[in-house]
C-alpha cells in the first residue's frame, strides 16, 4: 500500500536507550501492514560516515569544530543519497539519529548544543515529521551497554551519558514525542506504531 505522503521519522536517545532496535522494529511493523518504509542510521555507511565511526571508536581524534563539520558533511550525504530519494519514491523514512544527536553529543563548554542545532538549521536540513525520544536513566543505559559484546565507544561513560541527556533536554523541540525507555521493546514499538498511525490518520489499526 502506498500512502499519499511519505513521512520522515527520527529516533533519538542516549546510547543504550533502545532507539536502534525501535527504528528497525517499527520499520518492520509498517512494512508488514503494506506501508512502504525504509530505515537508515547516522553516521551513514558512506565514506563520510566511516570516517566518523573511526572517531567514535577512538581510532582518531578530532577537534570539536572538526567533529561538527564531519557530522554536517555526513548528514548532507545522508539526505542526498538516502533520505530524500526514498521520500521522493513514496517510502516513509525512519532514521536512527539526526541533528539532535550531534547537538547533544558534540556540545561542550566551548560550544552550546543550541549553537550546533542552529548550524544544522542554516544548512536547511529537512525537519522530521515525527521525532521520538527514548528517555532512559543513564545508569540503566550504561548497564545495558555493559552487557553488549561490542567495544565501547568514546561516549559510553556515566558522566558522558548524563551530560548528553541534559543537552537533549535543552534542545529537543516541544513537539518531540517522549517515550519511557524502561518499557519493554515490544510495548515501545506498539506505542510508537499507534502514534504514527494516529498522527497521520491511517486506519490500519
From Swiss-Prot:
SUPFAM superfamilies: P-loop containing nucleoside triphosphate hydrolases. GO terms for biological process: dTDP biosynthetic process; dTTP biosynthetic process; dUDP biosynthetic process. One of its GO terms (cellular component) is cytosol. Keywords: ATP-binding, Kinase, Nucleotide biosynthesis, Nucleotide-binding, Transferase. PROSITE patterns: THYMIDYLATE_KINASE. Pfam families: Thymidylate_kin (PF02223). It catalyses: dTMP + ATP = dTDP + ADP. Gene3D superfamilies: P-loop containing nucleotide triphosphate hydrolases. One of its GO terms (molecular function) is dTMP kinase activity. ATP binds at residues 13-20. The keyword Electron transport does not apply. Its EC number is 2.7.4.9. Belongs to the thymidylate kinase family. PANTHER family: THYMIDYLATE KINASE, UMP-CMP KINASE 2, MITOCHONDRIAL. Phosphorylation of dTMP to form dTDP in both de novo and salvage pathways of dTTP synthesis. This is Thymidylate kinase. The gene is tmk.
Amino acid at each position: 500500500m502506498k500512502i499519499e505522503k511519505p513521512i520522515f521519522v527520527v529516533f533519538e536517545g542516549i546510547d543504550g536507550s533502545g532507539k536502534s532496535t525501535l527504528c528497525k522494529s517499527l520499520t518492520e511493523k509498517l512494512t508488514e501492514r503494506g506501508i512502504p518504509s525504509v530505515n537508515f542510521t547516522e553516521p551513514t555507511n558512506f565514506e563520510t560516515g566511516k570516517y566518523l565511526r573511526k572517531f567514535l571508536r577512538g581510532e582518531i581524534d578530532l577537534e570539536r569544530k572538526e567533529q561538527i563539520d564531519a557530522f554536517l558533511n555526513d548528514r548532507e550525504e545522508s539526505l542526498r543519497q538516502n533520505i530524500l530519494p526514498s521520500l521522493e519514491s513514496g517510502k516513509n523514512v525512519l532514521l536512527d539519529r539526526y541533528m539532535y544527536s550531534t547537538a547533544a553529543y558534540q556540545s561542550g563548554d566551548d560550544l552550546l548544543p543550541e549553537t550546533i542545532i542552529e548550524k544544522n538549521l542554516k544548512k536547511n536540513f529537512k525537519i522530521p515529521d515525527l521525532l521520538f525520544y527514548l528517555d532512559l536513566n543513564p545508569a540503566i543505559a550504561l548497564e545495558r551497554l555493559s552487557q553488549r559484546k561490542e567495544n565501547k565507544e568514546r561516549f559510553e561513560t556515566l558522566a558522558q551519558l548524563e551530560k548528553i541527556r541534559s543537552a537533549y533536554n535543552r534542545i529537543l523541540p516541544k513537539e518531540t514525542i517522549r517515550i519511557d525507555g524502561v518499557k519493554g521493546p515490544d510495548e515501545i514499538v506498539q506505542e510508537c506504531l499507534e502514534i504514527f498511525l494516529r498522527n497521520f490518520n491511517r486506519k490500519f489499526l
